[in-house]
UniProtKB/Swiss-Prot annotation:
Lineage, uppermost ranks: Eukaryota, Amoebozoa, Evosea, Eumycetozoa, Dictyostelia
CDD domains: Rab1_Ypt1
Pfam families: Ras (PF00071)
Locus of motif Effector region: 62-70
Organism expressing this protein natively: Dictyostelium discoideum (Social amoeba)
Lipid addition sites, N-myristoyl glycine: 2
Record's protein name: Ras-related protein Rab-1C
UniProt keywords, alphabetically: GTP-binding, Lipoprotein, Myristate, Nucleotide-binding, Palmitate
GO-annotated cellular components: endosome; Golgi apparatus; lipid droplet
Length: 201
């Protein structure tokens, strides 16, 4: 399940992969273009995270992402314009063939679980198997526990989640798309880590 996408602003969603905006040599729109893939079970709030990051919006109206959607946002890191193409993948098994094709070329991956759902946390292992199969060996990862505003319904203790992430040497943090908690920080952290790992021209 996902949030209904906004129709306004530069963060509008599209399922058409030809809608990218590329800078030219004479009028560059950005210094670096990064592709980030957001994966995880259906209903963990992936679309809501993108909507919050791209448009600073949240809606309680839910629709399932069909296939793959994306949003674009340009940020500044160390004086450089970084354009982020953030891909929101469907969590349902029936879209697996479609979504796994988008792993190729991804610079970073955010694996999302719902802190109120132990099943979604346990699914991280399955998602990481797909990452190992389809993504570049150099892809950087971030595990995110979303919906931390629902702490009273928490099913996944952060200490347990952090121990799991530490064993895999993957950073982890918790977010709330509804309350806009650490959403920007999550995407910016991953983008910063990718930038640091990329050879500078």
């Amino acid at each position: 399940m996902g949030c209904s996408p906004s129709k306004e602003g530069n963060g509008s969603f599209s399922s058409t992969s030809t809608s990218f905006i590329h800078g030219s040599e004479s009028h560059p729109e950005y210094d670096m273009l990064l592709k980030i893939l957001v994966i995880g079970d259906s209903g963990v709030g992936k679309s809501c995270m993108l909507l919050r990051f791209a448009d600073n919006r949240f809606t309680d109206s839910y629709i399932s992402t069909i296939g793959v959607d994306f949003c674009i946002r340009t940020i500044e890191l160390d004086g450089k314009k970084i354009k982020l193409q953030i891909w929101d993948t469907a969590g349902q098994e029936r879209f697996k063939t479609i979504t796994t094709s988008y792993y190729r070329g991804a610079h970073g991956l955010i694996i999302v679980y719902d802190i109120t759902s132990m099943d979604s946390f346990n699914s991280i292992k399955r998602w990481l198997i797909d990452v190992d199969r389809f993504a570049s060996p150099s892809v950087l990862k971030l595990i995110v526990g979303n919906k931390c505003d629902l702490n009273s319904k928490r099913a996944v203790d952060f200490k347990i989640a952090k121990k799991f992430a530490d064993e895999l040497n993957i950073p982890i943090m918790e977010t709330s798309a509804k309350e806009s908690t650490a959403i920007d920080e999550a995407f910016i952290k991953l983008a910063s880590d990718i930038k640091k790992s990329t050879p500078q021209k």
